[in-house]
């Protein structure tokens, strides 16, 4: 029976929540944890070890070393610069490129040949940075993309229609950020368009605007109150890791590298993607409305502009 090993880089709010979920579900045989704060990594390892008796399967959790990368199936990168007050996710770019370039080079030099999974913001651009620095094939690098935004969209719609969130299909695509696109043309419950399920006197545009704005804004609202968002995104990462390790063939809206899909090329962006043992196996092209497609292209233009800035920073470093 195949043994599964992951390395987690960054044991902050997101990383530790992810690690706890991995232990609770017993998804892997071994998990190595690396953090710039070695005492924090050590303390998390001890704490997680004491949780293993309650997990579904035993996970060997230990402090990671350079040697751990070589035989890992997946490296999950939760390391990130801190988001300063008033900054957007995209403003994190320069600091995180400075962190990522030497880190990715070292991981690749170790002989690692598995999959990179990351939520670090700006996640679409950082996914591109990992691809450029590692020179790995596109399927081996998966950013969390708009998976969390999609979950938020599902949740808000589920409250409106009094159904479980996982019974709502409502994709968010594009940038994980302000230019994200709510795909109302494909939002469904039990196969029925959600807009058709509303009372006949509903102001549809007002309803759509309200839900879309709440979906975009809620991350900032959470951040203002607790300084981070970590529970939803950590479970998104768990779902991605599980899909790769166990060939789940699930579809998630993650940061994938498009090469012609949706009329876009050479950009990491949130799109529906089949995830299995091949990583980001293939992109699903939804039939978007003209407005949605235009919004997606606008979102891609924003990401591409920052990708060019990332390229300039990398060129100076390498």
UniProtKB/Swiss-Prot annotation:
Keywords: Cytoplasm, NAD, Oxidoreductase, Phosphoprotein. It catalyses: (S)-lactate + NAD(+) = pyruvate + NADH + H(+). CDD domains: HicDH_like. NAD(+) binds at residues 14, 35, 40, 66, 144. It is an enzyme of class 1 (oxidoreductase). Substrate binds at residues 89, 121-124, 149-152, 229. It comes from the Bacteria. One of its GO terms (biological process) is lactate metabolic process. One of its GO terms (cellular component) is cytoplasm. One of its GO terms (molecular function) is L-lactate dehydrogenase activity. It holds the Pfam family Ldh_1_C. The modification Phosphotyrosine is found at residue 220. The active site is at 176 (proton acceptor). It is found in: Cytoplasm. Its EC number is 1.1.1.27. Belongs to the LDH/MDH superfamily. LDH family. NCBIfam families: L-LDH-NAD, PRK00066.1. Catalyzes the conversion of lactate to pyruvate. Homotetramer. This is L-lactate dehydrogenase. It comes from Staphylococcus haemolyticus (strain JCSC1435).
């Amino acid at each position: 029976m195949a043994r599964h090993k992951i390395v987690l880089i960054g044991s902050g709010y997101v990383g530790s929540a992810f690690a706890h979920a991995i232990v609770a579900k017993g998804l892997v045989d071994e998990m190595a944890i690396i953090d710039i704060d070695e005492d924090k990594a050590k303390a998390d390892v001890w704490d997680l070890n004491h949780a293993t008796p309650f997990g579904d399967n035993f996970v060997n959790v230990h402090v990671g070393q350079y040697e751990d990368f070589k035989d890992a199936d997946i490296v999950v990168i939760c390391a990130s610069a801190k988001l300063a007050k008033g900054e957007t996710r995209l403003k994190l770019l320069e600091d995180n490129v400075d962190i990522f370039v030497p880190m990715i080079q070292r991981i690749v030099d170790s002989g690692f040949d598995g999959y990179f999974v990351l939520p670090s913001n700006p996640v679409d651009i950082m996914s591109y940075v990992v691809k450029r620095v590692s020179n790995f094939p596109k399927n081996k690098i998966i950013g969390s993309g708009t998976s969390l935004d999609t979950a938020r969209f599902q949740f808000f719609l589920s409250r409106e229609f009094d159904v479980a969130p996982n019974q709502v299909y409502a994709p968010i695509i594009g940038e994980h950020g302000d230019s994200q696109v709510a795909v109302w043309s494909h939002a469904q419950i039990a196969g029925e368009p959600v807009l058709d399920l509303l009372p006949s006197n509903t102001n549809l545009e007002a309803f759509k605007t309200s839900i879309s704005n709440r979906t975009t804004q809620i991350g900032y609202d959470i951040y203002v109150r607790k300084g981070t968002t970590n529970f939803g995104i950590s479970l998104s990462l768990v779902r991605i890791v599980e899909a790769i390790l166990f060939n789940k063939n699930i579809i998630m809206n993650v940061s994938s590298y498009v090469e012609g899909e949706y009329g876009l090329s050479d950009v990491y962006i949130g799109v529906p993607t089949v995830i299995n043992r091949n990583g980001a196996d293939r992109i699903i092209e939804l039939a978007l409305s003209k407005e949605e497609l235009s919004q997606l292209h606008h979102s891609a233009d924003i990401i591409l502009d920052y990708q060019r800035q990332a390229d300039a920073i990398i060129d100076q470093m390498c």
